[in-house]
């Protein structure tokens, strides 16, 4: 396949890139039993696939009404924010709570447009320098939350 075709952003190219990324990820984690290393590897894989510099796991604590960043992967040279973001009040993120209950992703593609509808959420992301975001929900037994990718640069149309 020519380089020109592979540079296009077609469903075939996206699927092929995803398959390659999953193969590399599976090979690197195949013999790992350390759950922290596995989660870090998955976050790194997600960030690299989407061309992002940071990916994290945000878990919901329904009893306390907060979101907690439990894992974070950052590209070299990017400052970690996990320790600063331990008790995210759910009332500032009503859209996220609704999306999680409906098992739907959260997408931020335009921070200015978001500010008109969800000003607290937009202010939060602006404060931390995030301008776009993709977040996919997960639910496993008692844990629920999102795997989030900050400022993705590739495959953002899906």
What is each stretch, according to the model?
Residues 1-37, 48-49:
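Signal-transmission linkers at sensory-effector interfaces
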Residues 97-106, 113-117:
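Soluble sensory domains of the PAS superfamily and closely related sensory modules
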Residues 131-139:
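A short, aliphatic-rich beta-strand micro-motif
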Residues 47, 56-98, 104:
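GAF sensory/regulatory domain recognition
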Residues 63, 138-144, 152:
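Flexible loop/coil segments at beta-strand boundaries within sensory signal-transduction domains
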Residues 26-33, 42-61, 100, 125-126:
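Short regulatory alpha-helical segment in sensory/regulatory domains of signaling proteins that mediates
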Residues 2-12, 115-119, 145, 150-158:
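Regulatory loop-to-helix N-cap segments in sensory/regulatory domains
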């Amino acid at each position: 396949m020519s380089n020109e075709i592979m540079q296009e952003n077609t469903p075939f190219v996206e699927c092929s890139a995803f398959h390659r990324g999953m193969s590399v990820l599976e090979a690197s984690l195949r013999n790992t039993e350390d759950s922290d290393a596995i989660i870090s590897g998955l976050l790194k894989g997600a960030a690299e696939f989407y061309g992002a510099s940071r990916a994290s796991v945000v878990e919901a604590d329904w009893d306390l009404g907060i979101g907690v960043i439990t894992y974070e992967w950052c590209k070299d040279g990017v400052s970690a924010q996990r320790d600063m973001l331990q008790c995210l009040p759910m009332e500032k993120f009503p859209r996220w709570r609704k999306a999680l209950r409906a098992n739907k992703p959260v997408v931020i593609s335009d921070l200015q447009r978001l500010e008109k509808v969800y000003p607290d959420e937009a202010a939060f992301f602006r404060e931390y320098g995030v301008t776009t975001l993709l977040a996919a929900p997960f639910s496993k037994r008692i844990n629920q939350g999102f795997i989030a990718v900050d400022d993705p640069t590739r495959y953002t149309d899906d």
